[in-house]
Amino acid sequence: MSSSTLLHLLLLSSLLFSCLSCLTNVEDEFSYIEGNPNGPENWGNLKPEWETCGKGMEQSPIQLRDNRVIFDQTLGKLRRNYRAVDARLRNSGHDVLVDFKGNAGSLSINRVEYQLKRIHFHSPSEHEMNGERFDLEAQLVHESQDQKRAVVSILFRFGRADPFLSDLEDFIKQFSNSQKNEINAGVVDPNQLQIDDSAYYRYMGSFTAPPCTEGISWTVMRKVATVSPRQVLLLKQAVNENAINNARPLQPTNFRSVFYFEQLKSKLGVI
């Protein structure tokens, strides 16, 4: 039995017998289930302030293909400086997120400093890479002083446990065993995340959930990290029934440029 099949079986049993929060949730404002009245194809019609979800021309996520990128060596490795800081875990009903209380460090893009604010998790992944959708995606949301946003995305496939999520497992379990939607997680270190910035994609897009705000700088890591089936199961158990698979469908690229950086190597080592 594959790990993916096992995950689905465990998830079904957990929803039937132990997901107490699913029994008491009222209908959500939006759903990830295609075909539902409040599903992804209808997000733009649910509220006037969500109109961009249906009419925006630079929406995320998108399909990333190596044969449709513009190579740009001037991008360079990410200039990031993260630090351990107090954080809380929040269950929005649609996803589990890490919300940093203090200064968790920053990322610099085009000489603009973006502070790390929170980390969202989506399963399966929202972005696809060369036709493949992965088991999990972590999205690190950053904001600048003038309210510009930048998201760093890490794609995961099943394998060894992710060290960052390993530190949070006991807290995530509490969401599926109680009515809590916010838990203090103590000091959380974003450096535990498996970020390999030797190769990545860069494009302009949007947030992937309503109100689907555009003008977001996306950086998607080329190297895929690993996460255990158990860790993904815990994230799925925590959310509402209509967000178990909380990945927005792929959006049209609409002739946007997707840039690609890869650190060059020579016989003497990395250039």
Swiss-Prot record:
Storage protein of tuber. Involved in protection against oxidative stress. Has carbonate dehydratase, trypsin inhibitor, dehydroascorbate (DHA) reductase and monodehydroascorbate (MDA) reductase activities. Catalyzes the reactions of carbonate dehydratase and DHA reductase independently of zinc and glutathione (GSH). The coupled reaction is capable of recycling a plant antioxidant ascorbate using ubiquitous compounds H(2)O and CO(2). Exhibits antioxidant activity. Able to scavenge 1,1-diphenyl-2-picrylhydrazyl (DPPH) radical. Exhibits immunomodulatory activity. SMART domains: Carb_anhydrase (SM01057). Not glycosylated. Changing H120A: Loss of dehydroascorbate (DHA) reductase activity and carbonate dehydratase activity. It comes from the Eukaryota. One of its GO terms (biological process) is response to oxygen radical. Its EC number is 1.6.5.4, 4.2.1.1. GO terms for molecular function: antioxidant activity; carbonate dehydratase activity; L-ascorbic acid binding; monodehydroascorbate reductase (NADH) activity; nutrient reservoir activity; protein homodimerization activity; serine-type endopeptidase inhibitor activity; zinc ion binding. This is Dioscorin dioA3. Belongs to the alpha-carbonic anhydrase family. Monomer. Homodimer. It comes from Dioscorea japonica. Residues 1-21 form the signal peptide. The active site is at H94.
